[in-house]
Amino acid sequence: MTDLTTHDLAQPGWQTRDHLNDPVVGELCNRFGPDAFTVQATRTGIPVVWVKREQLLDVVTFLKKQPKPYVMLFDLHGMDERLRTHREGLPAADYSVFYHLISIERNRDIMLKVALAENDMHLPTVTKLFPNANWYERETWEMFGMAFDGHPNLTRIMMPKTWEGHPLRKDYPARATEFDPFELTKQKEDLEMESLTFKPEEWGMKRGTENEDFMFLNLGPNHPSSHGAFRIILQLDGEEIVDCVPDVGYHHRGAEKMGERQSWHSYIPYTDRIEYLGGCVNEMPYVLAVEKLAGIEVPDRVKTIRVMLSELFRINSHLLYISTYIQDVGAMTPVFFAFTDRQKIYDLVEAITGFRMHPAWFRIGGVAHDLPRGWERLLREFLDWMPARLDTYVKSALQNTILKGRTQGVAAYNAKEALEWGVTGAGLRATGIGFDVRKWRPYSGYENFDFEVPVGDGISDCYSRVMLKVEELRQSLRILDQCLKNMPEGPFKADHPLTTPPPKERTLQHIDTLINHFLQVSWGPVMPANESFQMVEATKGINSYYLTSDGGTMSYRTRIRTPSYAHLQQIPSVIRGCLVSDLIVYLGSIDFVMSDVDR
């Protein structure tokens, strides 16, 4: 039985805590001794424990085999610690690697950290304990240079094979003008062309058996069913998929590196573009994490407005997913229906925020401006329209026997497999685990809303995943109706020195406010040195921001964990033995965009 009461809503999220009273810290100390760990006090809301490198595998194994085990590796990445000035009480480190684990039964997390010296960047792989560590370790090596001993294929994943250097190191340039001018010599051109030559062995695949050769097929990176710049290399025996390797990174824009050279405030527009369909949903975890650093508690009106915008974008994203999923199976009409409905949402979003897809409207401490006059009428008209329209999608397409025959039982996995691969969102809930952050770990006032979490019957297949999204749409409509009926009165910004920008109306009356306004608009707010973390239930699964402040106007390290990255890594384990046509349906059922994968 999962304990949903372990996250104390009365405890301020911005309070710095060491979590020494968390049971898992006591369990670790009892097993390995108190001297084996350094517990770091942060504003992440979870225990952060530094572990000795030689004990890493033992500690991770212990946590995974405990009663109420830590069964999901939620995230794994690194940090360049060399320029960090506020490291009081922490182990000496030039670099560090963190492992974020989740226990579903406890509804609790723990973050393990390992300190590394620049002259010894080796540590053991955890891929035998958590298979989804594969891509995370590859990316961490690529971005920082840590070598994970025993990794099955430690190669570049985001950057081209010929790329030189580790981009997230502090001594790696962040701007194109800091590089030497690019010159494409004949030698370099030949090298680049050679790197594009397909060699199955480099991808971990066999050319054939003793009796026959396999056929290899490139699906993407410009195939309509790959849903973006995404390539899958298929190893085929006839129509059967013997093996496949997803190839990502074509949409990589260095979003985490950008976080190190933008102010806390000016980075908000970038969050919209991590997953470009989610809009304000993607602003939420970043803004909440910054507010934890700042110690800001926002008014109830701000919380409810943020929930309302998030649910509008959730419906908007789900409509596109459902309609393109149906299109992948072979029906065209629902796509045109969906774009008509999505237009109504965009009109409403534009009336409130002034923008459509990428509003960049949430602010540190509030929102950009108050709700406009007449917003209630627009929202009521949409709520009156959408329920019957949703029934039309179900009756006209999703109950179609041909669609059911193409999707039921296809690309199926159970709860254990979902947790091993870090699956979240509807894919996980279809297996029977109702992990929805809005319910399990409420944020922005979600605890005040009455809604249900749709859950499947134990197996997540292509049909159950899309039907769960339909039910989630209905629940989002319930939440919007409550926002309409119960919108609190009050300010749209918190009265706090780090609210950015501060309330404009007081700048000409109070010198303190004028100074804050001038500094925060010109340089950006200065956040206290600390670490914070926030996860939210985004449109495609759990999205999170892990921020490190060194007491400046910019983030020292911005780590963005997106759901689509984990979901694409799972593809080979699910689709082996299926047909190419099944893969097309499976891709349509995942609900991903490549900006969310590649960041």
Swiss-Prot record:
Catalytic reaction annotation: a quinone + NADH + 5 H(+)(in) = a quinol + NAD(+) + 4 H(+)(out)
Name of the protein: NADH-quinone oxidoreductase subunit C/D
Origin superkingdom: Bacteria
Organism, scientific name: Pectobacterium atrosepticum (strain SCRI 1043 / ATCC BAA-672) (Erwinia carotovora subsp. atroseptica)
Subunit structure and binding partners: NDH-1 is composed of 13 different subunits. Subunits NuoB, CD, E, F, and G constitute the peripheral sector of the complex.
Span list, region NADH dehydrogenase I subunit C: 1-189
Keyword Transport in annotation: yes
Organism ancestry: Bacteria, Pseudomonadati, Pseudomonadota, Gammaproteobacteria, Enterobacterales
Keyword Nucleotide-binding recorded: no
Localisation per UniProt entry: Cell inner membrane
